[in-house]
């Protein structure tokens, strides 16, 4: 009985050690892969299109605001037949950014009071 118990403890120890090494290998591989993807993205990055500027050449080139990326929006200006595409921020995202900004400011005030 002691032999079975000793063998079981040894088996569990070896299994946990091998799985921990495998996880470390996976973490290192994921980290290396992530770094290479970031380097490729930085090399591929180009200048973004500012808000309210024409984005018809590339609809995915709109700049990011503080939290969200602007969207290339198509519309017809009043009294015109030509379609216009500009980078704009949707209203619901604008309101979410304002709420997040107010929450951040309020959090700073609380930190001053109790910090």
UniProtKB/Swiss-Prot annotation:
Signal peptide: 1-20
Highest taxon, organism lineage: Eukaryota
Propeptide stretch(es), residue numbers: 21-44
GO cellular component: extracellular region
Main localisation: secreted
Compartments (UniProt record): Secreted
PROSITE patterns assigned: SPIDER_CSTX (PS60029)
Disulfide bonds: 48-63, 55-72, 62-87
Membrane-spanning intervals of the chain: none
Gene Ontology MF terms: toxin activity
This protein's UniProt keywords: Disulfide bond, Knottin, Secreted, Signal, Toxin
Expression tissues: Expressed by the venom gland.
Cross-referenced InterPro entries: Spider_toxin_CSTX_Knottin_CS
Family, as annotated: Belongs to the neurotoxin 19 (CSTX) family. 01 subfamily.
UniProt remark on domains: The presence of a 'disulfide through disulfide knot' structurally defines this protein as a knottin.
Protein name (record): U3-lycotoxin-Ls1u
